[in-house]
Amino acid sequence: GASTSASSNSGTAPPSPMIRKPYLLFLADAPDRNACKTAFGVAFWRPHECVGELRYPEAKTDCGTPAMDVREAARRGAKTLLVGLAPSGGAFAPRWIETLLEALDAGLDIASGMHVRLDSVDAIKDRARSKGRTLHDVRLPPPSIPVGTGRKRPGKRLLTVGTDCNAGKMFTSLALEK
């Protein structure tokens, strides 16, 4: 996905740096398990890469990782807050923005797969820049991906497709990778 480096002032994202591990999974106020499929997938398939999860008291689900706030996650070595849910409408709630700002203040980068880009929220973009943090919008491809040619390449690939956002493509791909 595309990343916006804190040092970048252009509208074009630099080459995508790796998302730093381990993660703090952000569940916010998730109403159910389906709302936070990303967090569940990472907790299930990469538990060793998660220090814990941050969920608000009214959240109706958890991933089974230790509950903690941003400061505790930073003390335990978290490097990136991973936005692990996608609400209907795909926007960041004001309360979430405050939590994301707190994560940046604690020295964490932020990774998100939501439709709304992290750097489209001025407060997040400005804070990341001032703190030297990186914002990863993983839904956006980096500009360096070449256009396909149809020519055979080395390696194996598998396309997983589904008719909606809840068809199990990620879990299928990760199960095959394992």
Listing of model-derived features with the role each one plays in the protein:
Residues T99-L101, D105-R157:
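Extreme N-terminal, non-catalytic leader segments
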Residues L82-A86, S112:
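Redox-cofactor binding/interface segments in oxidoreductases and associated redox assembly factors
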Residues I145-K178:
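Walker A (P-loop) phosphate-binding motif
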Residues A39, V70, W96-L100, E177:
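Generic hydrophobic/aromatic pocket-lining and core-packing "Φ" positions
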Residues S88-W96:
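Glycine/threonine-rich flexible loop motifs
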Residues A2-S10:
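Low-acidity, Ser/Thr- and Arg-rich intrinsically disordered low-complexity segments
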Residues P15-E72, G77-A78:
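N-terminal accessory targeting/assembly segments
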